[in-house]
From Swiss-Prot:
InterPro entries: cNMP-bd_dom, cNMP-bd_dom_sf, Ion_trans_dom, RmlC-like_jellyroll. It comes from Arabidopsis thaliana (Mouse-ear cress). Residues 589-604 are annotated as: Calmodulin-binding. Keywords: Calmodulin-binding, cAMP, cAMP-binding, Cell membrane, cGMP, cGMP-binding, Ion channel, Ion transport, Ligand-gated ion channel, Membrane, Nucleotide-binding, Transmembrane, Transmembrane helix, Transport. GO terms for cellular component: plasma membrane. This is Probable cyclic nucleotide-gated ion channel 10. Belongs to the cyclic nucleotide-gated cation channel (TC 1.A.1.5) family. The gene is CNGC10. Residues 103-116, 192-204, 265-366 are extracellular. It is a multi-pass membrane protein.
Length: 711
């Protein structure tokens, strides 16, 4: 048989089963270790593609397709989420370099924090490793040809050369600019080898290198975020996680602006020192940096660069620090305590970003004004995005509750409009409340109906199979038949005191109880003096009148009439099998050739139990009646024999005394009265010794119709 070209991509090892390749359970989610294991495995295992070409070409094709990763594979999708998180962390690590310059207040010079240099460089290198892995993945990840997306998912391109050309022409340049270790080079290589003031060079180089790399790193996050949402539909699994994700972006922006505020504050103080040094005779610029050996004092800088608020400056010759006055007056630029600097600057950024920069009093310095404008615009955009996205995520957690409130309000208005009695209203409210508690507003049938058939079958097996096997009637069935039954079952709910079916109504479905208790009662067609009730619990079933009707190929279109009334004693959860579905499944019953199923049905059927009990009781009453009649006959025969013997004695004696004649007359009268009483007792037996009218024997379900019976 010839097959068309198959575009499916599978990681397949001929020596192992498919389930062992992925190593994922049905409910398991890949962890970080699992992702790295799958990454390693993905580069070792070639892809398996169906082909119709000659074996030599197949081997060549297998070699060229080696190490190609399926973009729809779960481990790659999880890696994209991890890399997206790593990109956010990278944006948070880069501003740490801005805290390296420190002002030495004692010597009035600029120095560097060597410990922070090493720590920030190591963290930046660790995050860059994620970028390297991502670039390698991009050279090994297949893509869907745009021209093939007219129908379906499109054709997967697995050629390594085509993949490389596509990546080189798209995001490779951005990824390359993002991964360049410019801050590490500045801190660990450039600074130790220059003869100029190290603090000044470090401050300037770090500012430009990090800002230059920030742009491609931010640009790379947007297509990555789009790819994650396109393949998996979501970034976070829960609404609260989504709200936290958007809040973290807002906090990241606060951290970035706080770090920039710190660095520019140091720059403004350094600028003030330079201007003061130019005006002071004998001042050398290089002595403004602590790494230079010097024996001079810079105490004049204290009076030349006072830290005054912009509103307190009356002399135009005084240096205006603008919005950076707070950082200088608080001494945060002079502190060697990193966490003190970090949290103070973070709080400044968060406060002004939330206030949209309204309280910032700037100087006439253009860079400071641009910085304040960027805070205002960024705060406006980020705050709008934060509120909008958090509202969207948080509303998703309450949308079901709102639907429930609207439904309850509509139900109350409808009940009031129709003037329903209070007892019916209570039953409706109780049903809606119980249904909400069980389903949380999710329409399960609609959700399952939109899924593929095989997936729907697996879900139904997961939901119903274990519960069905608790029902003895299903416990002895094979897996194929259970699959057919599971696919047609639908969950139903019954509130307390509600009627499932009434005696004399058509039976439209068979019910299998999973939780709760019911009572099944019958009056044997309304016959006076007859009543039978049986309690049903979990694993019991009712509506068995439908089974003989469904098993009969010649049955009419009219549903059978129920012989029992079934009422819920508590809240009941059950699975229902409708008459049409049972009719379609019944053909598989007839293929079982099993007497065991027939005996099991009889044993657990309420109708068969009732009929069996009535039959046994009737047989017992017949036995008691026959035993009583036999004892009465024996007593009558004994009395007759006594009378006969007395008559013989009377005829043999020719002469008798008056006393003997009186005794004979008394004995004769006693025997006559005893026989009369025996006959009267037989005709007036109590009802428990009489044979009542038996219930109609249930219809025998033909499990082997049109088939030979097993010996």
């Amino acid at each position: 048989m010839a097959f068309s070209h198959d575009n499916r991509v599978r990681f397949k090892d001929e020596g192992k089963p498919l389930s062992s390749e992925y190593g994922y359970g049905r409910k398991a989610r890949p962890s970080l270790d699992r992702v790295f294991k799958n990454v390693k495995w993905g580069f070792k295992k070639p892809l398996s593609f169906p082909s119709h070409k000659d074996p030599d070409h197949k081997e060549t094709s297998s070699v060229t397709r080696k190490n190609i990763i399926n973009p729809q594979d779960s481990f790659l999708q999880n890696w994209n989420k991890i890399f997206l998180f790593a990109c956010v962390v990278a944006l948070a690590i880069d501003p740490l370099f801005f805290y390296i310059p420190i002002v030495d207040s004692a010597r009035h010079c600029l120095t560097l924090d060597s410990k922070l240099e090493i720590a920030a460089s190591l963290l930046r290198t660790l995050i860059d490793a994620f970028y390297i892995i991502h670039i390698v993945f991009q050279f090994r990840t297949a893509y869907i040809a745009p021209s093939s997306r007219v129908f379906g998912r499109g054709e997967l391109v697995d050629d390594a050369k085509a993949i490389a050309l596509k990546y080189l022409s798209s995001y490779f340049i951005i990824d390359l600019l993002s991964i360049l270790p410019l801050p590490q080079i500045v801190v660990l290589a450039v600074i130790p080898s220059v003869n100029q003031p190290v603090s000044l060079l470090t401050k300037d180089y770090l500012k430009f290198s990090i800002i230059a790399q920030y742009v491609p790193r931010i640009l790379r996050m947007y297509p990555l975020y789009t790819e994650v949402t396109r393949t998996s539909g979501i970034v976070t699994e829960t609404a609260w996680a989504g709200a936290a994700w958007n809040l973290s972006l807002y906090m990241l922006a606060s951290h970035v602006f706080g770090a920039l505020w710190y660095l520019i504050s140091v720059e403004r103080e350094d600028r003030c020192w330079q201007e003061a040094c130019e005006k002071t005779k004998g001042c050398n610029m290089k002595f403004l940096y602590c790494e230079n050996d010097r024996n001079v004092s810079n105490n004049f800088l204290t009076t030349s660069c006072p830290f005054l608020d912009p509103g307190d400056i009356t002399n135009s010759t005084i240096f205006n620090f603008g919005i950076f006055t707070d950082a200088l007056k608080s001494g945060v630029v002079e502190s060697h305590d990193f966490w003190k600097k970090f949290f103070y600057c973070f709080w400044w950024g968060l406060r002004n970003l939330s206030a949209l920069g309204q309280n910032l009093q700037t100087s006439k310095f253009v860079g400071e004004i641009i910085f304040a404008i960027s805070i205002c615009i960024s705060g406006l955009v980020l705050f709008a995005l934060l509120i909008g996205n958090m509202q969207k995520y948080l509303e998703s957690t309450t949308v079901r509750e709102e639907e429930m409130r609207v439904r309850k309000r509509d139900a109350e208005q409808w009940m009031s409009h129709r003037m329903l009695p209070e007892d019916l209203r209570k039953r409706i409210r109780r049903y809606e409340q119980y249904r909400w508690q069980e389903t949380r507003g999710v329409e399960e049938e609609t959700l399952l109906r939109n899924l593929p058939k095989d997936l729907r079958r697996d879900i139904k097996r997961h939901l119903c199979l274990d519960l069905l096997k608790k029902v003895p009637l299903f416990e002895i069935m094979d897996e194929q038949l259970l699959d057919a039954v599971c696919d047609r079952l639908r969950p139903v709910l019954y509130t307390e005191n509600s009627y499932v079916i009434r005696e004399g109504d058509p039976v439209g479905e068979m019910l299998f109880v999973m939780r709760g208790r019911l009572v099944s009662a019958t009056t044997n067609g309304g016959r006076s003096g007859f009543f039978n009730a049986v309690n049903l619990k979990a694993s019991d079933f009712c509506g068995e009148d439908l089974l003989p009707w469904a098993l009969d190929p010649q049955s009419s279109s009219h549903f059978p009439i129920s012989t029992r009334t079934v009422q819920a004693l508590t809240e009941v959860e059950a699975f229902a099998l409708t008459a049409e579905d049972l009719k379609s499944v019944a053909s598989q019953f007839r293929r079982l050739h099993s007497k065991q199923l027939q005996h099991t049905f009889r044993f657990y059927s309420v109708q068969w139990r009732t009929w069996s009990v009535s039959f046994i009781q009737a047989a017992w009453r017949r036995y008691c009646r026959r035993k009583l009649a036999k004892s009465l006959r024996d007593e009558e025969d004994r009395l007759r024999e006594a009378l006969a013997s007395q008559d013989k004695e009377h005829n043999a004696a020719t002469v008798s005394s008056s006393l003997s004649l009186g005794g004979a007359l008394y004995a004769s009268r006693f025997a006559s009265n005893a026989l009369h009483n025996l006959r009267h007792n037989i005709s007036n037996l109590p009802p428990r010794y009489t044979l009542p009218l038996l219930p109609q024997k249930p219809t025998e379900p033909d499990f082997t119709a049109n088939h030979t019976t097993d010996p």
